[in-house]
Design a protein with these regions (language model features):
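Active-site signature of alpha/beta-hydrolase-fold catalytic machinery across serine-
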Residues: 107-112
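Generic hydrophobic alpha-helical segments
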Residues: 71-79, 106, 438, 442
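Helical cap/lid subdomain of alpha/beta-hydrolase-fold lipid enzymes
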Residues: 120, 128-448
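Gly/Ala-rich beta-loop-alpha elbow adjacent to hydrolase catalytic centers
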Residues: 98-102, 106
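Short active-site segment of divalent metal-dependent hydrolases/proteases
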Residues: 20, 102-103, 152, 378
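Active-site catalytic motif of lipid deacylating hydrolases and related acyltransferases
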Residues: 4-94, 152, 163
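Short beta-strand immediately N-terminal to the catalytic nucleophile in serine-hydrolase-like folds
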Residues: 96-98, 148
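Alpha-helix termini
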Residues: 2-5, 40-52, 80-90, 113-138, ...
């Protein structure tokens, strides 16, 4: 549909993180290298607008693993506060861009706003004196929503993590202990943990990222007062992040697939509720666009049927039914493990179809997807809503599309050695030109 872009007000783009998300932990950013693309795109857009109304990019920092309702409420409060303070003004064009679980947060937010448009929300003030903003004031600004790799119908990975809660708690406990024990160098502790628990993980870039983070938060690494202050700040951020994960892991319950219709989370809305949801978007002039990601196939699983669940104590479930793994030698162990966890489980393609179809981002051609196809975290067929077969399909893993698809040296002086990493190591062929093309298209849609 053709749209007319505003020539008098700003486009305000807000990036919302997904599960385990953050704006930044020390110098590690959730959305990595998106700002340079935005700045380059925005200069050209502002020149074309002819009025100097430069688009604005915001990064929202949410709780990492809290339930969707809690995360949505925090996003609402953040937006309402910006309205009250004049950062978001009447006539501005608000666009929310979300990766992964962040898309469910946005759906829950908009659902709540649409259901209670006259709700009065107090901001910044004492009882009886606070500024107030109505829900409809936020709805009136919101014009675009972009979904990136969002588990619109849940993910098998959540089911797998929930089934292995004891292992997850042990891992988080070990990491919290490493951060808390200031009397022993953190990197040495991490290496010792890896030697005890999973030596092969130490060769993955995810392990390298964790090691970098621990090095960065060690105040003994430098005598420079600014470096020491940055280390203490990074330490506090990571400690708080891990504390949140330890105390509130409700997001996993909201992401579990195969329980469609219970209404507890947007991932499990039934067909009639989803229709009411999209009708509400249309009523308020909100347009959406979905991007799905599909990683390289790490195992040779059976066509047209769900894969068996991966059970750590059952070796017969570790690879495909015939036991002959066909993983690319370039994929690392983290990707193979997460891919296998996501491949098997309760997720089904809506309507009981054997496969689904999406539109390749690079060529515009249709591509068939198996129920077990995934990006290492989310089943790809779960991302195909509300656009269905028109969903733009990007070849890449769950971290690629947010900038973590290659290892790049850090530019800013800090103890951290690298700025970004290939966190999942899927060998999916995701490149710099794809990253830039996707994000330029996202920003163009937000402002369109």
């Amino acid at each position: 549909m053709a749209t007319t872009r505003s020539t008098t007000h700003r486009t305000q783009v807000v990036l919302v993180p997904g599960f385990a998300g953050f704006d930044a932990l020390g110098q590690l950013h959730y959305y990595a290298d998106v700002t340079p693309i935005f700045r380059d795109w925005a200069r050209g857009w502002a020149a074309g607008a002819g009025n100097g109304a430069h688009p604005v990019l915001h990064y929202f920092d949410n709780l990492p693993t809290a339930g969707v309702a809690t995360r949505a409420a925090r996003l609402r409060d953040w937006l309402v506060k910006r309205v009250a303070r004049g950062e978001l003004q009447r006539g501005d064009r608000l666009a929310l861009v979300a990766h992964s679980t962040g898309g469910l947060d946005i759906r829950q937010l908009v659902w709540d706003l649409v259901q209670r448009p006259d709700e009065v929300i107090p901001v910044d003030g004492a009882a009886g004196e606070a500024c107030t903003v109505r829900a409809r004031d936020v709805l009136g600004l919101l014009k675009r929503i972009v979904f990136l790799s969002v588990p619109q119908r849940g993910t098998n990975f959540a089911s797998w993590v929930r089934a292995h809660g004891a292992a997850r708690k042990a891992l988080v406990a070990d990491l919290r202990g490493a951060v808390a024990a200031r009397d022993v160098p953190l990197v040495a502790q991490l290496q010792a943990w890896g030697a005890r628990n999973a030596a092969s993980l130490m060769r993955s870039e995810l392990f390298l990222a964790i090691q970098d983070a621990l090095t960065e938060m060690d105040p003994r690494a430098s005598d420079d007062p600014k470096r020491v202050a940055a280390a203490l700040e990074a330490w506090a951020e990571v400690e708080l992040w891990l504390r949140y994960i330890w105390s509130d892991f409700a997001a996993i319950d909201d992401l579990v697939a195969g329980e469609d219709g219970d209404g507890a989370t947007p991932a499990r809305f039934d067909a009639s509720t989803r229709k009411r949801e999209t009708d509400g978007w249309e009523t308020h002039g909100i347009e959406t666009r979905s991007y799905a990601t599909v990683g390289s196939r790490a195992f040779n699983l059976e066509h047209g049927v769900r894969a068996p669940q991966w059970r750590l104590l059952n070796p017969s479930t570790w690879a495909e039914p015939d036991g002959s793994a066909t993983a690319s030698p370039k994929t690392d162990v983290v990707y193979r493990m997460s891919y296998r966890a996501c491949a098997g489980g309760p997720f089904e393609i809506p309507g009981g179809a054997a496969t689904a179809t999406a539109t390749r981002f690079d060529s515009g051609e249709a591509q068939e997807l198996e129920v077990w196809d995934n990006d290492g975290i989310v089943n790809t067929a779960s991302m195909l809503w509300p656009d269905g077969p028109a969903t733009r399909l990007v070849a890449g893993d769950h971290a690629d599309v947010i900038g973590h698809f290659r290892r790049v040296k850090a530019v800013q002086p800090a103890a951290r050695e690298y700025h970004t990493y290939d966190l999942l190591g899927s060998a999916s062929g995701f490149r710099e030109e794809t990253f830039e093309a996707v994000w330029r298209e996202v920003f163009e849609f937000c402002a369109g």
